[in-house]
């Protein structure tokens, strides 16, 4: 399986109706126009590393799931339940982690059909207020382990 095929599986999964991200981007997050309100929820794929072993290649891919946080104009001190604040960050984080869980499950099944492995333990890291236009979400790193076809085909 090639890098291109891996990114294609990630893209197709993130646009699947069960996951349903509005926009999927790839590369540097700085190249994405995050000020556009119509692109969210957004999934952004950034390649991290490719580790070459004797017979395998481990591709690490960072996937960031982002959405807009809506704020109301109320003062937090006036809220009857200040735990929930004056925004929907909890809703955004809950929704996006669910989308990522579903996506990882779909990706695992797609890769298993091709005898390709994904690391079993996946850590998701939340972020809030990381971007200037009130975005929150999760970042996860998927490590996909594929046979090194160049070695397996005797090219080396």
Spans of features found by a protein language model:
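A short, highly charged nucleic-acid-interacting micro-segment common to nuclease
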Residues: 1-8, 89-97
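Short, well-structured alpha-helical interface segments that form or flank functional binding sites
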Residues: 5, 37-40, 58, 95-98, ...
């Amino acid at each position: 399986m090639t890098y291109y095929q891996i990114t294609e599986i990630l893209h197709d999964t993130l646009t699947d109706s069960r996951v349903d991200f509005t926009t999927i981007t790839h590369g540097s997050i700085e190249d994405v126009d995050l000020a556009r309100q119509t692109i969210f929820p957004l999934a952004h794929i950034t390649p991290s590393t490719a580790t070459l072993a004797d017979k395998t290649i481990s591709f690490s891919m960072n996937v960031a799931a982002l959405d807009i946080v809506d704020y109301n104009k109320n003062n937090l001190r006036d809220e009857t339940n200040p735990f929930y604040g004056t925004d929907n960050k909890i809703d955004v984080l809950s929704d996006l982690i669910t989308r990522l869980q579903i996506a990882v499950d779909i990706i695992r099944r797609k890769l298993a059909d091709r005898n390709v492995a994904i690391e079993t333990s996946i850590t998701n890291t939340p972020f809030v207020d990381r971007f200037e236009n009130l975005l929150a979400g999760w970042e996860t790193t998927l490590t996909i382990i594929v046979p090194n076809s160049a070695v397996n085909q005797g090219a080396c």
